[in-house]
Design a protein with these regions (language model features):
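Active-site cofactor/cluster-binding pocket
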Residues: 1-164
Length: 164
């Protein structure tokens, strides 16, 4: 089983991103479950969401405390929240940022890093700083665990196509 924890701020689509990635993984024949975390979050407040996927049925529907991968859709979040808490040694970080690797906050447990200037791309393409779908593409490129075609199909054939 592979576990992903999404970090973002309210309104950035971290919860939606987990659902979109689950749909793409299902499209490729995997078992996947996204687990939103709701509380008293408001727009701009830190939020988390979770995703598990496997070749076998998934029965565990709890929060993820020791993820294999972190997807952070907000480039400033690591300054105020310990996004690396519990990351497995050698884990993967997929981070939205316009900074070079040397200037990005990266914990010692991180083994693989994927960076994406998602805000600039989103502003150019969508005219809004909606980075969640771009970060899924960065996840696909960084890990190779889902194809861009599956991501595209899951977005085109679902309710997510109207989300931004």
């Amino acid at each position: 089983m592979y576990e992903v924890r999404f970090h973002g701020r309210g309104g950035q689509g971290a919860v939606t991103a987990a659902s979109m990635l689950a749909a793409a993984l299902l499209e490729e024949g995997k078992y996947a479950v996204s687990i939103p975390s709701f509380g008293f979050e408001r727009r701009g407040a830190p939020v988390v969401s979770f995703l598990r996927f496997s070749d076998r049925e998934i029965r565990q529907l709890t929060n993820i405390y020791t993820p294999d991968c972190l997807i952070c859709v907000d480039p400033t979040l690591a300054k105020s929240v310990d996004i690396f808490s519990g990351l497995k040694p050698g884990g993967t970080l997929v981070q939205a940022t316009n900074k070079p690797l040397e200037q990005v906050i990266i914990a010692d447990t991180v083994g693989v890093v994927g960076l994406c200037d998602a805000i600039a791309i989103a502003l150019e393409v969508f005219k809004r700083p909606i980075t969640n779908t771009l970060m899924l593409g960065a996840f696909a490129k960084t890990t190779g665990m889902v194809s861009l075609d599956a991501l595209r199909r899951s977005l085109e054939d679902s309710d997510f196509r109207d989300a931004g």
